[in-house]
Amino acid sequence: MYKRQALDGVLELAPYESCVVVLEASGAIEPADCTDTSTRATLALDISHPWTVALSPAGSDRTFGEPQKLERLCDLTAEQFPGVCGTFRYRTSFELADDLAHTVIDLGDVYEVATLTLDGQTLGTRICPPYRFATGALTAGAHELAIDVINTLDHATSDIFALTEPVAPSGVLGPVTLLGQNLPK
């Protein structure tokens, strides 16, 4: 997320999260945005409901197979796609009743690399937690969400370590949530 803002000297980061802070060369400090957000409720919308998921096997030309319906988020290599590696494409839609400001989509637990697309716009790629994507303001109405998750080759290849070490899960385990603030009416 790129935004200009004044800092109060405290920077809170989630585990594995990083942030680049750029200071003005002049040393000038701009006043903070003093908008009162205390009257705006923070909204958390669970979007872990039914998804479709399709697989593009590793080494393919990124052609995805027929989408399968998922009633719940789970380890895909333990259930729907055992013993495979590649890219899993998740799709779902959700509806917002009101306009929201400062929204973030949090994918919860993901294994391994996730790229998020909202309403046709790619919002970025994450390689480790937190799997959070700033979406900016969202308008009321229907929204389309797609997540491409790439797992690792250890799901398709057996080796001596696989006998004693468990293989990590694959895919989005969730919960997937949309966090935001209601805009004042």
Q: Can you annotate each of these PLM segments?
A:
Residues 94-96, 100-119, 126-127, 145-149:
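Aromatic-lined ligand-binding clefts that engage carbohydrates, nucleic acids, or primary amines
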Residues 7, 60, 123-124:
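Short, isolated positions in well-ordered beta-strands
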Residues 10-13, 135-139:
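Short, flexible loop/turn segments at beta-strand junctions in immunoglobulin-like
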Residues 9-31:
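C-terminal beta-strand-rich structural cap/linker in extracellular carbohydrate-active enzymes
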Residues 19, 103, 141-143:
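Exposed beta-strand face motif in extracellular beta-rich ectodomains
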Residues 28-88, 138-185:
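An acidic-aromatic loop/edge-strand motif
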Residues 1-2:
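Short, small-residue-biased leader/transition segments that mark boundaries at the very start
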Residues 7-9, 19, 88-92, 129-133:
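Short strand-edge motifs at loop-to-beta-strand transitions and within beta-strands
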